A protein has these predicted regions:
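Long, low-complexity, Lys/Arg-enriched
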Residues: 1-103, 111-348
Length: 348
């Protein structure tokens, strides 16, 4: 097994690996530790002690089970441009890099969106383009996500960029002159405390129609209502969102989010086809679970030569609520495992 995780201060960094190893079995387990820096001025640098603690825990967990290999990701080009998503997409370039393993596990619990989205897409692409009787057909690809909505709210984006960008490789078709006149439909997955990001993405996309996604049902039955209250003036007064345009999906089921968003896109494509076509942009501003659902939508449509954009706003780092460090030595929440490709997947 190859276990892939990102280095960081998030207390969930090693929880998935710990649960997996404690479940038993003596098979070989190697780890790939993704390393990246948001810059010397990043507020995340203040939590270096938490990072060291997580790395020490990783080394202790691995013990004699296998090796730990570090793979760096560049977040900025020489010109100062953000290239994290493109770098993440190039982390693995060939299916043969997974030779000797039966399972790949990617734990995104402590991984930024700009890194895990293109990385998931790249691994799926490597597996899908591999012939049925070759190495890729024998690999299982699993995704681990430790969901803790309270902790997510306590880790805030700091230094949000002034403009939004499209996550590589989901955005190249959005600015084509040949389709400039096509209506744009924007589908943002709403989460708490994301007003600046919503405003910047709206400025990038300039949509003709907006279909916000609300987490409902949710562990907190009023979470969807609270999000509507939080963004009421933005959604209804400024962006003129129609109440009938809201999409609802369970906050703990990315495959339901996938189905609901896919259904909405197909409906709009059929309705707008007399106008010469349409464009769609997704924005995952919610939990990692729902973000995965949005990514799978874009991935599957791209496989059929239909480009779906994913718009995102980068940040300079993250701020961790100090009370969390003092009062929450242990994480709450729950580990989710998604089996995205492998033995169950008949690709013939």
């Amino acid at each position: 097994m190859l276990f892939i995780l990102a280095k960081g201060f998030d207390p969930r960094m090693c929880l998935g690996l710990e649960k997996l190893l404690n479940a038993g079995g003596n098979g070989k387990c190697d780890a790939v530790l993704i390393e990246f820096s948001e810059g010397t001025s990043s507020p995340s640098n203040a939590y270096w002690q938490l990072v060291d603690k997580n790395v020490a825990k990783l080394e202790k967990l691995m013990g004699q089970r296998g090796t730990i290999a570090s793979r760096p990701i560049k977040t900025h080009s020489k010109e100062g441009h953000r290239i994290a998503s493109r770098s993440a997409s190039n982390l693995f370039k060939d299916i043969n890099e997974f030779a000797g393993y039966t399972d790949i596990v990617l734990d995104i619990s402590a991984t930024p969106r700009a890194v895990y989205m293109p990385l998931i897409a790249k691994i799926l692409h490597l597996l899908d383009k591999t012939p049925r009787n070759s190495l890729g057909a024998q690999l299982n690809f699993h995704l681990f996500v430790w969901e803790d909505s309270d902790l997510d709210r306590d880790i805030r984006d700091e230094g949000v960029e002034e403009s939004a960008v499209y996550v590589h490789p989901y955005g190249g078709a959005m600015d084509r002159e040949a389709t400039a006149g096509q209506p744009k439909v924007w589908i943002p997955l709403l989460g708490e405390g994301q007003r600046p990001q919503l405003e910047r993405i709206h400025a990038l996309v300039v949509p003709d129609e907006i279909c916000p996604v609300l987490p409902s049902p949710a562990l907190n039955p009023r979470r969807g209502d609270n999000l509507v209250v939080e963004y009421h003036d933005l959604l209804f007064d400024r962006l003129r969102v129609e109440p009938r345009n809201f999409i609802y999906c369970s906050e703990r089921n990315p495959f339901e989010a996938y189905r609901q968003i896919t259904r909405a896109i197909r409906g709009y494509r059929n309705s707008l086809s007399p106008l010469g076509g349409s464009k769609f942009v997704l924005s995952a501003l919610s939990s990692k679970l729902l973000s995965v659902g949005a990514l799978l939508v874009a991935y599957d449509f791209k496989a059929t030569n239909i480009d779906i954009g994913i718009a995102h706003v980068e940040c300079h780092g993250y701020y961790l609520n100090e009370t969390v460090q003092e009062t929450r030595p242990q994480c709450r929440g729950e580990l989710f495992g998604l089996w995205l490709a492998g033995e169950w997947d008949d690709r013939d």
